[in-house]
Every structure is written in structure tokens, then in C-alpha cells.
Amino acid sequence: MNPLLQDYARILLEWNQTHNLSGAKCLSELEPQITDALKPLEFIKDFKSCLDIGSGAGLPAIPLALEKPEVKFILLEPRIKRAAFLNYLKSVLPLKNIEIIKKRLENYQSPLQVDLITSRAVASSSFLIEKSQRFLKDKGYFLFYKGEQLKDEIACKDTECFMHQKRVYFYKSKESLC
């Protein structure tokens, strides 16, 4: 793991001791989550902007932003302590490419148009698509980090679902919604 990702993991574990931002108690529990956040870089198309919905403790957005410093990331996180954590990360790590917005997706009003919309453990895929597609460019993609429950949430083609261990990555183009 690169040193910046190690710094992120260390800071998250420190904050977890008092703020319970994630279930991870040690680095060996957090490393697979960071690897999981980065895995889609192996198969998704290049992107220049990303909206992460329900950023929480920063997964997947922070590892992605650290690996792709040329990409603009907008992190939507309504909860105060999680937004404070994300702002702290921005102040101590080289994360000039992120903007943190303390709002729920349903309350976020913006002319924003991004190439990629990500989300991990937030809501059903159909809800996320319905509420966020207005922020996605016509040639953009949704990337949702899901589990086996994906098949109960939404119909998806084999070309839209990628598996790695217990994770299902749902990767769907906006164009295919029509």
C-alpha cells in the first residue's frame, strides 16, 4: 500500500477510537477495504470528475482521490462527524482535488455534471440512480460498491456487474438507462 494510503488508514484508525467512523479496529481490517475501493480502477473507463454519495469514512472516495490526484472529487456526506473527518483528511493529506459538501443527496441542488458517480453501502441502486442521474454527464457511469443483495435491488447485465471476493461492483452507463 502506498504511503498516502497508509497515512489515510492510520488517521482513520485514530479517529475510530473515539468517533466510530468504520468497523475497522486495526490495519489488517482496513487494508482489504482500501483494496476494495481501488479495485475498479482495473476495469472502469478513465474519468475526470466524480461525485461520491454518502462518503462516510472516505471509502471509496479517499483512496480513489489519493490514487487519482488529477481527478476532481465531490464528496456528499450529511453527518457532522463524518464530514468533519473528511475535512480533517483534506487538511492533512494532499487532497486538494476533493470538495466536501455536508448535504444529503436528496437536498443537494447543483448544476454539477460529473463523469462518474460512486457510492458504497448507502442505499439501493435504483434509488441512487433515480436521485443522482441529473448530476451525471450523458456519457458518464455509475459505480456502486454492492454485495450479493444487488440482484434483489436492480436488474443488471453481466457486463455491468464485476465480482471480487464478496464484493459486486455495479458499473452502468447513463446511456444504458434509456
UniProtKB/Swiss-Prot annotation:
Enzyme class, UniProt record, top EC level: transferase
Chief localisation class: cytoplasm
Enzyme Commission number, as recorded: 2.1.1.170
Keywords on record: Cytoplasm, Methyltransferase, rRNA processing, S-adenosyl-L-methionine, Transferase
Gene3D superfamilies membership: Vaccinia Virus protein VP39
Compartments, record wording: Cytoplasm
Amino-acid positions noted as binding S-adenosyl-L-methionine in the UniProt annotation, renumbered to this chain: 54, 59, 105-106, 120
Catalysed reactions listed for this entry: guanosine(527) in 16S rRNA + S-adenosyl-L-methionine = N(7)-methylguanosine(527) in 16S rRNA + S-adenosyl-L-homocysteine
InterPro entries: rRNA_ssu_MeTfrase_G (IPR003682), SAM-dependent_MTases_sf (IPR029063)
Annotated GO CC locations: cytosol
Record's keyword annotation contains DNA-binding: no
Molecular-function GO terms, alphabetical: rRNA (guanine-N7-)-methyltransferase activity
UniProt superkingdom: Bacteria
Keyword Transferase part of the UniProt annotation: yes
Family that this chain belongs to: Belongs to the methyltransferase superfamily. RNA methyltransferase RsmG family.
Listed PANTHER family: S-ADENOSYL-L-METHIONINE-DEPENDENT METHYLTRANSFERASES SUPERFAMILY PROTEIN (PTHR31760:SF0)
Function summary: Specifically methylates the N7 position of guanine in position 527 of 16S rRNA.
NCBIfam families recorded: rsmG_gidB (TIGR00138)
HAMAP family referenced in this protein's UniProt entry, alphabetically: 16SrRNA_methyltr_G (MF_00074)
Protein name per its UniProtKB record: Ribosomal RNA small subunit methyltransferase G
Species of origin: Helicobacter pylori (strain HPAG1)
Gene this chain is encoded by: rsmG
